[in-house]
Amino acid sequence: TSERLEIGGHPLVTGVDKPTRKEALDYYRKVVHNEKLNVKTFHEVTNIKRLAVGFETTAQTDKGQSVTLKSRFVALATGYFDNPKYLGIPGEDLPNVSHYFTEAHPYYERNVTIIGAGSSAADAALDLFKAGANVTMVHRGDSFRFSLKYWIKPNLENRVKEGSIKVHFNSVTKEITSDAVIIEKRLEDGTPETIIIPTDQTFALTGYYASTKLLEGVGVVIKSEDFSAQLNEDTFETNVGGFFVIGSAGYGTRTSDIFIENGLIHAEKAVKEVVRRLENTPVSA
């Protein structure tokens, strides 16, 4: 809801209970403007180096220039969408296959197959259906995930029930071609059946994971079981003093645990700790 997305005491006013992506982006841009925050867009951080005091962050601009910034603290909040979970099957690198969904309009009256059944896959399926695409979903499980957003799950299930969106449960994708997706479906008696789904475009929305490259580069301890960072969840500081990780960036493959709402709580705790140190005052009870 709007209230859960608000930051810095700035109200997010929308016409409906849940703001659209555009409304949220407009809101955050206005917060940056009103607070006069020093935001450097089109700067990709390539390295973070620990110094005797503080850190040195190196970034590459869209013009190919290298920029170096020094700071006493660093808070990493890069999310996890840079790293798709690849299927490792033939045809995954074809031009009609994508691990990211942007918009539905180009696929009007096209056959679209979505691999996956998480929130990203569910959102894409509904958007594509509304835009007039012929949508088929493929999921290895026997039902939609319980973790689906509560306002999306009933809508998706109703579209499947009425036949507007087709779904193959208990199915594993074996291969993607230029005009089809080949799956192996487990029938009720346990026997496998090969099914060929005519497809113009495939969206493999099977999840993402947070990169550990920058974390490991600065010396943050990474847990081997899920690639999450060692964090103090009272402050979201890592084992490296002065280095904080906010949101899903520190949770490796545990991305379903983190949302915008609780990521904002991480930020509040981290900023409170940074302010405390800058002011050199004890944390109030």
PLM regions with names:
Residues 76-77, 114, 204-205, 245:
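Redox-cofactor binding/interface segments in oxidoreductases and associated redox assembly factors
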Residues 100-145, 191-195, 213-214, 234-283:
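Rossmann-like dinucleotide/flavin-binding elements
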Residues 76-92, 208-220:
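Flavin (primarily FAD) binding-site architecture
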Residues 1-27, 164:
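Glycine-rich active-site loop/strand segments that organize a redox cofactor
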Residues 227-235:
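Short glycine-rich, acidic/polar surface loops and turns
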Residues 1-7, 88-91, 246:
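Short, flexible, mixed-charge acidic loops at enzyme active sites
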Residues 40, 79-80, 248-249:
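Glycine-rich His-Gly loop
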Residues 26, 34-71, 130-226, 282-285:
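A Rossmann-like FAD-binding core segment of flavoenzymes
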